[in-house]
Amino acid sequence: MSAGEVERLVSELSGGTGGDEEEEWLYGDENEVERPEEENASANPPSGIEDETAENGVPKPKVTETEDDSDSDSDDDEDDVHVTIGDIKTGAPQYGSYGTAPVNLNIKTGGRVYGTTGTKVKGVDLDAPGSINGVPLLEVDLDSFEDKPWRKPGADLSDYFNYGFNEDTWKAYCEKQKRIRMGLEVIPVTSTTNKITAEDCTMEVTPGAEIQDGRFNLFKVQQGRTGNSEKETALPSAKAEFTSPPSLFKTGLPPSRNSTSSQSQTSTASRKANSSVGKWQDRYGRAESPDLRRLPGAIDVIGQTITISRVEGRRRANENSNIQVLSERSATAVDNNFSKPPPFFPPGAPPTHLPPPPFLPPPPTVSTAPPLIPPPGIPITVPPPGFPPPPGAPPPSLIPTIESGHSSGYDSRSARAFPYGNVAFPHLPGSAPSWPSLVDTSKQWDYYARREKDRDRERDRDRERDRDRDRERERTRERERERDHSPTPSVFNSDEERYRYREYAERGYERHRASREKEERHRERRHREKEETRHKSSRSNSRRRHESEEGDSHRRHKHKKSKRSKEGKEAGSEPAPEQESTEATPAE
């Protein structure tokens, strides 16, 4: 209990003037004196508080006299709640505890260092560099801490390290950040946005390229919160400006044809510019460096001149948009740069300054051009399917010489030129011959007659094969029969038996030959009948006509003979009709 409460209880118990004393205690002179003191304390903080501030500008709390009285009367003398009267100075908040070494394990990354700003703002400055006991955050060595609570058993690492860091990865991260800020390490330009965030502040490395007045800005480093437009306008970020990096183009977009030849130049330039970024950042306080600016102009590459196209590749933290290529060139620049084609391009090759139409595939780069030696089966004069004519000079087989008798078109007719954008390119002369010269369409009806003849020939061949097969079979059968019927040499005792066996063998051979001839005759007759039945419809009329003529002549002949015999009978000679009848019978 406080002293005022004790006095009030005593006055209530004593009675009498207790009410007046209570009013004096509530509204008396003491209260009037205390109010201006509190107002003065809130307006002007006491000098003792300023003397006890820590090194990095965060005040240590000081206990006032009234709080001393209340603490002396309270039961808990080691209360952790401390009240600070006055303005809280800006800076990174410290969470130190009394009696122990102040260790801040809630690590935040450093913000932008742009030098001192003129005015102090109330609240927490998010752009202030993080520090632990006045030491910059990236230079703090974790091994210097005596107490390492994150190593204790059962400790949760997420209470001490944010964003999945542990002790080893945090050391590596600090080392890398120090090297990047000193300009010793080149920031890699990748296709994704690399963000390393710790608690509230983010550091964003944005790959992309900007052109302002013809100069390229390869990358832009942002630290702190993104989207703070006031601070971004007041404090411009660092930009290194040099020539076009070829690796920023996506594969779907048509790059310049000589990107490979300029790649080595731009990579060396990027290394030099990156190494010098950190030096002038520390020296000039991240202001724009006049030394790195280059005059706008064109890059001279062997064979042709190309201008710098405008590429913008900014990304925010929550956007996954592709790098946009915006070609902003006037017509006069195109006409000045490409009034004449390069000397080594053929007349039929597509020009480089015109964008390809959207419905055609992009022209291949020098590295992806099709090989000049085609696979077997494809003539070298025909480009592979899916590819336009390759850039650069065509192979010698595509260029017709003066002595070659090729005409400029197909079959002495000029072929239609295929459009490529707004420019038409004629076909290359001396290409493959046309289809009508390969396939003769005027004699298509010969094909069917030829096919019928081939079929008949195949049939005859099959028949001959069958006959040969049958003959072979019969010969083997004969040999087997002779083997079966042939007696042993001991049987041939007499000449008669030998003669009888020879006669038997000859008779068997004659019989077999007769049967074979009969089979062949029978087979030929069958074949003839098949052929006749096949062509019966065409021959039937002529056969009928022939048979009727034969029948008529035969009848006429018989009629004449019968007349003669009648005349002979009338003459009265008997042997004459017999002779005539005998003559007539064989005629029948």
Swiss-Prot record:
Residue ranges of the region described as Disordered: 1-81, 223-291, 334-588
Q: According to its record, what are the GO cellular component terms? A: mRNA cleavage and polyadenylation specificity factor complex
Segments for region (Sufficient for interaction with CPSF4): 122-228
Span list, region Arg/Asp/Glu-rich domain: 451-484
Q: Which residues carry this modification: Phosphoserine?
A: S70, S72, S74, S289, S486, S490, S494, S548
Q: Where is the composition biased (Pro residues)?
A: 340-398
- Pfam families with a match to the protein in the record: Fip1 (PF05182)
Q: Name one GO biological process term.
A: mRNA processing
Give one GO molecular function term.
RNA binding
- Give the residue ranges for region: Sufficient for interaction with CPSF1 and CSTF3: 437-588
Function, as annotated, reads: Component of the cleavage and polyadenylation specificity factor (CPSF) complex that plays a key role in pre-mRNA 3'-end formation, recognizing the AAUAAA signal sequence and interacting with poly(A) polymerase and other factors to bring about cleavage and poly(A) addition. FIP1L1 contributes to poly(A) site recognition and stimulates poly(A) addition. Binds to U-rich RNA sequence elements surrounding the poly(A) site. May act to tether poly(A) polymerase to the CPSF complex.
The entry assigns this protein to a family as follows: Belongs to the FIP1 family.
Q: How does it assemble?
A: Component of the cleavage and polyadenylation specificity factor (CPSF) complex, composed of CPSF1, CPSF2, CPSF3, CPSF4 and FIP1L1. Found in a complex with CPSF1, FIP1L1 and PAPOLA. Interacts with CPSF1, CPSF4, CSTF2 and CSTF3. Interacts with AHCYL1 (when phosphorylated); the interaction is direct and associates AHCYL1 with the CPSF complex and RNA. Interacts with PAPOLA; the interaction seems to be increased by the interaction with AHCYL1. Interacts with NUDT21/CPSF5; this interaction occurs in a RNA sequence-specific manner.
Protein name in UniProt: Pre-mRNA 3'-end-processing factor FIP1
**Taxonomic lineage:** Eukaryota, Metazoa, Chordata, Craniata, Vertebrata
